[in-house]
């Protein structure tokens, strides 16, 4: 068996086209969806990520601005800037690129963003909404994973899903989203004993720990769906996920590649969240 590929690039392209159409409709009503991105410091990876986010936005008709500040910017100044954006009716989404400089409290910064503009889905109010099923913004990476499962017509009801990783950004919200679709969910992490004992029982596996080859072919049930959230650098500098792709693809039924899998979907769902923030504000 060779697994079928879930092409994140192709799916993200479809979603961007949908966003462009809805954005045009909103503009026709006099509302221009707008995203403000804040970058503090000069981390090379963050510079690349924010550039992609601006380009994605403008390509779909969303207005996007990137504000860059030096790494020695005070936390108080950053919070003041966020509050000003909260009060600006022309701004619908606010994204502070992580990681922040060490002298800043990331959670405090995130909590300063208005929940109505928290398009990253990291605010505690967004987490609470996800937990209870109330309206809110889902974190972009697990949201993208769910869209990938939807794209292959996968029915999660009654299926056993194993999430490897327990971060607030991916692991925990991923588990909640799967649970909301009536999957039976197991969360594994660094203290889990005998990881393979859990993954071999799984119909769906989401690997999200940032560790190469944490999931190998012998740990996967034949026909399982494998979603690889990992983003790691190999010795030659090329990107690799958390999954041993070459081995696992011979066992799994469906698998996402790295690159070209979850990454493009994360960016696409940011556009969806920003558009929905604008649509809600326009009501």
Swiss-Prot record:
GO biological process: L-histidine biosynthetic process; methionine biosynthetic process; purine nucleotide biosynthetic process; tetrahydrofolate interconversion
MF-aspect GO terms: methenyltetrahydrofolate cyclohydrolase activity; methylenetetrahydrofolate dehydrogenase (NADP+) activity
Catalytic activity field: (6R)-5,10-methylene-5,6,7,8-tetrahydrofolate + NADP(+) = (6R)-5,10-methenyltetrahydrofolate + NADPH; (6R)-5,10-methenyltetrahydrofolate + H2O = (6R)-10-formyltetrahydrofolate + H(+)
EC number, UniProt record: 1.5.1.5, 3.5.4.9
Signal peptide: none
InterPro entries named in the record: Aminoacid_DH-like_N_sf, NAD(P)-bd_dom_sf, THF_DH/CycHdrlase, THF_DH/CycHdrlase_cat_dom, THF_DH/CycHdrlase_NAD-bd_dom
Pfam families to which the protein is assigned, alphabetical: THF_DHG_CYH (PF00763), THF_DHG_CYH_C (PF02882)
One CC-aspect GO term: cytosol
Binding site for NADP(+): 165-167, 190
UniProt keyword list: Amino-acid biosynthesis, Histidine biosynthesis, Hydrolase, Methionine biosynthesis, Multifunctional enzyme, NADP, One-carbon metabolism, Oxidoreductase, Purine biosynthesis
Keyword Amino-acid biosynthesis set for record: yes
Protein's pathway: One-carbon metabolism; tetrahydrofolate interconversion
Keyword Hydrolase appears in the UniProt entry: yes
NCBIfam families (alphabetical): PRK10792.1, PRK14189.1
Listed PANTHER family: C-1-TETRAHYDROFOLATE SYNTHASE, CYTOPLASMIC (PTHR48099:SF5), C-1-TETRAHYDROFOLATE SYNTHASE, CYTOPLASMIC-RELATED (PTHR48099)
Protein role: Catalyzes the oxidation of 5,10-methylenetetrahydrofolate to 5,10-methenyltetrahydrofolate and then the hydrolysis of 5,10-methenyltetrahydrofolate to 10-formyltetrahydrofolate.
Subunit structure and binding partners: Homodimer.
Family designation: Belongs to the tetrahydrofolate dehydrogenase/cyclohydrolase family.
HAMAP family assigned to the protein according to its UniProt record, in alphabetical order: THF_DHG_CYH
Protein name: Bifunctional protein FolD
Species in which this protein is naturally found: Variovorax paradoxus (strain S110)
């Amino acid at each position: 068996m060779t697994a079928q590929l879930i092409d994140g690039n192709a799916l993200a392209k479809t979603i961007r086209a949908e966003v462009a159409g809805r954005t045009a409709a909103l503009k026709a009503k006099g509302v221009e969806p707008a995203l403000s991105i804040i970058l503090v410091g000069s981390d090379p990876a963050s510079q690349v990520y924010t550039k992609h986010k601006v380009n994605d936005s403008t390509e779909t008709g969303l207005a996007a601005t990137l504000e860059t500040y030096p790494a020695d910017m005070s936390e108080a100044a950053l919070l003041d800037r966020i509050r000003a954006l909260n009060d600006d009716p022309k701004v619908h989404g606010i994204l502070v690129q992580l990681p922040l400089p060490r002298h800043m409290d990331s959670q405090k910064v995130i909590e300063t963003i208005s929940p109505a503009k928290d398009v990253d889905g990291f605010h505690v109010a967004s987490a609470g909404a996800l937990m209870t099923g109330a309206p809110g913004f889902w974190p972009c990476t697990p949201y993208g994973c769910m869209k990938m499962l939807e794209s292959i017509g996968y029915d999660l009801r009654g299926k056993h899903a194993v999430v490897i990783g327990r971060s607030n950004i991916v692991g925990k919200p991923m588990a909640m989203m799967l649970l909301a679709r009536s999957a039976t969910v197991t969360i594994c992490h660094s203290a889990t004993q005998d990881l393979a004992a859990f993954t071999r029982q799984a119909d769906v596996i989401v690997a999200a720990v940032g560790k190469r080859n944490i999931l190998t072919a012998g740990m996967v049930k034949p026909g399982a769906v494998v979603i690889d959230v990992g983003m790691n650098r190999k010795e030659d500098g090329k990107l690799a996920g958390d999954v041993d792709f070459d081995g696992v693809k011979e066992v799994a039924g469906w698998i996402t590649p790295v690159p070209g899998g979850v990454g493009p979907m994360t960016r696409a769902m940011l556009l969806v969240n920003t558009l929905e923030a604008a649509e809600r504000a326009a009501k």
